[in-house]
Amino acid sequence: MQKINELQLAKELIRFPSVTKTDAGVIKFLEKKLKKIGFKTKILEFKDKNSYPVKNLYARLGTASPNFCYAGHLDVVPPGNLNDWTVNPFKPAVKKGYLIGRGANDMKSSIAAFVTAVGNFSKKNKKFGGSISLLITGDEEGIAINGTKKVVEYLRKRKEKIDFCLVGEPTNPNKLGEMIKIGRRGSMTGKLSVIGIQGHVAYPNRANNPSTALVQILKKLKEVKFDKGTKDFQPTNLEITKINIDNSADNVIPGLASASFNIRFNNKHTSYKLKNKINKVIKQICNKNKSKYKIEYSVSGEAFLTKPNKTTFMIQNTIKKITKIKPKLSTTGGTSDARFIRKIAPCLEFGLVGKTMHKVGECVSLSDLKRLTLIYTKILDNYFKWKLA
């Protein structure tokens, strides 16, 4: 079995400029690495007429249960202005105890840590009696149509059972060991267009200004108290993200006014119920103003919570022993691919410190990378000892 080093593998992965939509060969590269340490692999490429094709990878070591899965993504966000970087973002460099490069934090180093952990674990436990799998996508930072969502559908159709999934996203705000994600809020975007009647500002009786209704709707939506939050979740929150009145003249009442809003909601709601509540507000105000309207919704994911159990506490205690910090169980932050995986398996998220993700100069502490590898190794060790005892 080939020996793997987490720093070396992280560097190799970062060298691939796998900005979302561009695989650049990184999935195939990881597949070869996994094959060398005994994994059976399958590259899954999905296409959709409304989006770009995406390569994904599912790999499994062993055939027995339980199946411990690690999920992550190899696509990265664009590096931005290259002149703002001290190094080429796709030629990783180590400086002052940090590995610098695009994806060093989110999340190629986490993948490198887990693959190294599997190598360390399987070397000492050649017949551990279960399975370890990896679900790796090339589209988490993008629209995520042909990524983890379709891999989950594929696994479900094949009746591939995953007993537990650890998602390796950077979950810690400032220090390694601070936070485990046990759920995520739901996310829904609304695009609202209010249709009026264009006219001269001096003759408002001959027109119907759609901005009047739009402003009233947005004000009302911001005033809605959806809930007070729960023990595990923050209160549901709606933010207005765009307002547009396409009108270049000061003496013209516009015929169209539009706005977008995003709502992050907890598990007291579903997107369906929120749509009904919001639609009621829109309809009432538009009727009052004699305006027509059009509303379109897109749902990134529903809110979910993995209730803390023995696996949660085992992972929490394992992290505490290595970092000397007891991780908080949290549902804060944005969406992740856990929203898809939770449909087939209980899942938690734990990875690196996310302070530099998506930033110029993205980096990871070499100490954190080493400790994350140790944490992942110990989690595997404790999981299979407990499950197969």
State what each model feature region is.
Residues 43, 74-76, 135-144, 168-172, ...:
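Acidic, glycine-rich active-site loops and adjacent beta-strand->loop/helix elements
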Residues 107-183, 388-389:
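Acidic/histidine-rich catalytic neighborhood of metal-dependent amide-processing enzymes
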Residues 1-80, 256-260, 274-277, 366-368:
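N-terminal helical capping/dimerization or prosegment-like subdomains
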Residues 42, 69, 133-135, 294:
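A structural signal for isolated positions on well-ordered beta-strands in alpha/beta enzyme cores
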Residues 59, 92-94, 240-243:
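A structural signal for short hydrophobic beta-strand segments in well-ordered beta-sheet cores
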Residues 1, 171-175, 182, 188-389:
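Metal-dependent amide/peptide-bond hydrolase catalytic core
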